[in-house]
Regions:
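Active-site neighborhood of phospho(di)ester-bond hydrolases with catalytic His/Asp-centered motifs
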Residues: 48-50, 72-80, 100-103, 162-165, ...
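Active-site-proximal loop/helix segment associated with metal-binding centers of metalloenzymes
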Residues: 147-151, 159, 167-200, 246-250
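Active-site metal-binding motif and surrounding structural segment of the metallo-beta-lactamase
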Residues: 54-101
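Short acidic active-site motifs
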Residues: 87, 293-298
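Metallo-beta-lactamase
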Residues: 3-7, 102-151, 208-209
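FMN-binding flavodoxin-like domain, especially the glycine-rich phosphate-binding loop
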Residues: 174-177, 184-223, 227-230, 271-286, ...
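Conserved beta-strand hairpin/beta-sheet module of binuclear metal-dependent hydrolase folds
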Residues: 2-65, 153-156, 160-164, 265
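Terminal amphipathic helices with adjacent charged low-complexity linkers/tails
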Residues: 225-251
């Protein structure tokens, strides 16, 4: 169960190969995940984080097989969300007086979720530290809104390990634990998906926090995340990526998304994609039916894109329900510095393109003037409008 990290630091978490969704069903998981917890055994014994409640019995039994639980001097709670803290109530039944180091906001979230205000909470803020012996300390750094107000990271001096909690992680099961041992294509794809769907709304805070960490000039040999692979070879590569991603990131890509009732909007979507490829052969084009593709995977492609084109038929004087739900998720992610175009079909009233234009404008997209609004099934004149629409997107 224990896996060696460095010197007297071990991983004691859970690799969850069968996990398929997260945050309820709001985040899709394609390659498993892990809940990473760590055990430090210096002059003081410290547990950093726990695992999700469904694995609590296994976690506590495995931990008890490694050490006497009563020898744990204190627990560090970097974040109060249940995937990191679900095993805490059961663990505290066995060691009820053990101090728990966390932020003031984490006390609120832990008490609110588990209703145990009597626990021995020790609140910390950025710059506070605890001596763990052998010339080493744990230094705490608040990471507010990365991605909860209660979040923090913990830095271990001497071994130069940053226990980064939800920052710099991925939902990705890696049996060997290490990022350099993982499939690199999947690793970076999952890291970007995680950022795009969870952290992108907080990009200004990410940028500021990365700059703060860089100014501290701390030697960092390992970034021990709370999910997925742990970074040891050039660990700052993921920090540098976060800094890049936090600044209205885009590639030379346009993503076309739509849903359709009787294939009219689908035909327009594919015509627009073909026209992009014709006018700008080097631009990567992706096309997705919103009702047939996972929303998190689509949003990762939107994150990478410099522009999007969104299409819907008119239904009930608005857009089709799948597009309406997708737009609401798009709103949450707060993308910046991206263009958009709208298109759609209708039989009678034809409001879908108007609704799309209004919503995308509200969400910060620069919506180009040309659009395709097609009555019934598209004909040659409708398809011909794709040329001007694409020119405007590429301008």
């Amino acid at each position: 169960m224990r896996k060696h990290i460095k010197n007297n630091v071990s991983w004691v978490g859970k690799i969850d190969w069968e996990l398929q969704e997260f945050h309820g069903s709001d985040y899709s998981i394609n390659n498993g995940s892990s809940q990473n917890a760590y055990l430090i055994e210096e002059e003081k014994t410290v547990l950093i984080d726990t695992v999700w409640k469904p694995h609590s019995t296994e976690f506590i039994d495995n931990l008890a097989s490694e050490i006497d639980l009563n020898k744990i001097d204190f627990i560090v709670c970097n974040h109060g969300e249940v995937d990191h803290r679900g095993s805490l109530p059961a663990l505290m039944e066995k060691i009820p007086n053990t101090p728990i180091y966390c932020t003031e906001n984490a006390v609120k979230s832990l008490v609110g979720q588990y209703h145990h205000p009597e626990l021995n909470f020790k609140t910390v803020k950025t710059g506070d530290s605890v001596d763990i012996g052998n010339g080493k300390s744990l230094v705490f750094v608040e990471m507010r809104m990365l991605h909860w107000p209660d979040s923090m990271a913990t830095y271990m001096t001497g071994d130069n390990i940053l226990f980064s909690n939800d920052a710099f992680g991925q939902h990705f099961a890696v049996e060997e634990l290490w990022a350099d041992k993982a499939d690199q294509c999947r690793l970076w794809a999952e890291a970007m998906k995680y950022y795009a769907n969870i952290l992108n709304p907080f990009s200004p805070l990410v940028k500021a926090k990365v700059e703060e960490i860089q100014k501290l000039n701390l030697p960092i040999d390992i970034i021990a995340t709370s999910h997925g692979a742990i970074w040891r070879e050039n660990p700052l590569q993921i920090v540098e990526k976060y800094y890049e991603w936090s600044q209205a990131y885009q590639e030379d890509q346009i993503t076309v998304v739509y849903d359709t009732m009787w294939d009219g909007t689908k035909k327009l979507a594919h015509k627009i994609a073909d026209e992009i490829a014709k006018q700008s052969p080097d631009t990567r084009v992706k096309i997705f039916n919103i009702s047939k593709t996972n929303k998190n995977d689509i949003m990762t492609e939107v994150f990478k894109s410099k522009a999007i084109a969104v299409g819907s038929p008119t239904v009930g004087n608005s857009v089709i329900s799948s597009v309406a739900g997708w737009l609401d998720f798009l709103r949450e992610l707060k993308f910046k510095n991206k263009k958009a175009a709208v298109f759609g079909t209708y039989g009678w009233s034809g409001e879908s393109t108007k609704v799309l234009r209004e919503e995308l404008t509200k969400y910060g997209f620069s919506v180009v003037e040309p659009e395709i609004k097609c009555n019934w099934n598209p004909d040659a004149d409708d398809f011909g409008k794709a040329e001007e629409l694409v020119k405007a997107l590429l301008a």
